[in-house]
Amino acid sequence: MTALLAFVVIYLLGTLAIGLYAGTRVKTATDFALAGRSLPLIMIVTTTFATWFGAETVMGISAKFVQGGLNNVVEDPFGASLCLIFVGMFFAAKLYKMTLLTIGDYYRKRYGKSVEVLCSVAIILSYLGWVAAQITAIGLVFNLVSGGAISVETGMVIGTLSVLVYVVFGGMLAIAWTDFVQMIVLVAGLAIIAFMAGDLAGGPNKVLDLALTNDWFKFFPEPKLHDVLFFVAAAITMMLGSIPQQDIFQRVMSAKDAKTASRGSIIGGLCYFAFAFVPMFIVACAVLVMPEEAKRLLADDPQKVLPTLILNHMPFFAQVLFFGALLSAVKSTASATLLAPSTSFVENIYKNLRGGLTDKQELFAFRVVLVLFTGCVLTYAIMMRGTPIYEMVSTAYQVTLCGAFVPLVAGLYWKRANRYGALASIVMGITTWILLLATPLGEQFPPQLAGVLMAAAAMVAGSLATKPHTHQAHEAGHPEATSAPLHGHAHQ
């Protein structure tokens, strides 16, 4: 075992111990899924920031930046940061006050079980690519720090198991505790690495000159309709498509009060936006420090540019810092993306099939499904080996953008929105997206933009085509009953 690998193993065991200790405090399903709705502001900020700052931020976005500038990363970090800010501004307080366990519960309360199940399925499926990206990154880390002695696939299995153990025992509470520690390691580690990389490159001014020379600060597209449409589509994919995601919802709902939920999400988004530029700066330094090697890697395997700089051009302690920071980023995101779909499946699909569960039965079901989902996504990640990390992640959010975003917004902000409108929105949004994705039409007009526009149109048409329910007793019991269809209650 190399010294670097030994440090990585010690770090993994340390975070595992923290997670397991936190797990001793989990007594109920709410403790497991939402950390008992008790987290202070600092933990909401760190766990929100941690969820976003994953493998794609460290290795994916940074490589995309030096390949095409800011225009190439509009989706993440620009769209991703605004997503968290929008959640804090427009969604967190409203959803927190409803005391829900999952985002799927909102769809059931607002529109009924059919919408709950459809939106939950879309949300769960969207996690496949995101979790696969984190698992792939974990495998790559083990492969690199072992000098190739551990294959990427074996590393994927080891890393996934190290995350699974503490999430199974501690749920959201374990994630919040480990995220707090891991974000300290991440921020400190990458900040020191950035300082050292800048020094190797000849100072920040040289890096800035390189960026200006290569036009890397160009943000807006060419003034052509095709380019503008695809730019807008890329921006809204994570900006809006991530809003109805269970992992964000869990962090919002885990706060001790509504104000903390809102502030935590906004601050987390601002922190993410600021710090996402650090890996970009480091990779820009790599282009100056090792120009020929960086050029070759950018053409063959862009995700390895940053790790190669660290391994070949920096001292041992810098390598420990970097891989500690990288593992922190990957593990925090992986833990969140394993827990979120598992809780959604149990709460919004399994319970509908099986019927009512006691609190203990639900807690047990959360853990069993978590293990099963992890096994499935690990298999999927191994099968998808070779797909760029950034692409895995960006595709994931298109599902929820087209299927779940419009019903969420309309339900919160438009009283006339009803079950029929929501069903029409989901069906038309997803169908349009798939149609364009599977045909040459998708090269002319972005599939996700077409999908969300059709979803919005279908929501309006479907809701207005059905008269609102105005029965006085029904309205008295259900404040939002005016949005229910004439011949159907919202809880059917």
Would you name each region that the model predicts?
Residues 1-492:
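Membrane-embedded helix-loop-helix hairpins and adjacent transmembrane boundary segments
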